[in-house]
Amino acid sequence: MRSIRYWLGGLVLIALTVNLAGCGINDIPRLDEQVKAAWSQVQNQYQRRADLVPNLVATVKGYAKHESDVLISVTQARARVGSLQLPANITENPQAFKKFESAQKNLTGALSRLLVVSENYPQLKADQNFLTLQAQLEGTENRISVARRDYILAVQKYNTELRTIPGRWYASMFYPDAKVKQNFTTAKENFKAPKVSF
């Protein structure tokens, strides 16, 4: 009789384990891993862009020597990006995340000014090395957009799981160290249409 009780108890335990595994208890670690993977892609693409900057600046410098203000701003923005000490938990650290985002926005702005200045130099625009770097930069900016989108979606799913039931319960019982992840902000000026006058 006792062996039947133990056997039934084991079956109930197995059934509970399977039931809990199937009802979302593993969603939090799974979604956390998706956020980490998406964040790695964001970092990879930003690093790819930062690696293009020295060659782009050197190419432009050869043609536009007196545009030193723009060249210096790009070089300084890249240096700020390169000097950031990112904590391992950056996606959970609002101050570090904002610092990273701000440095990347500064580099984006400086690169935009550099490309606008390059329009004034027809010889530069015809240079094959510049054209190649410009195409690589454009492709990298597209990759950054895709990586950021994927990260935003992963964070949205993760944060929603932590804030809704039953995910909130699972987090409090099984994952007490789970924290809401930081997400990118979009400046309101990005939504304004540019004014065109003829």
List each model region and its residues.
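A helix-centric hydrophobic-segment signal that preferentially recognizes long
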Residues: 2-198
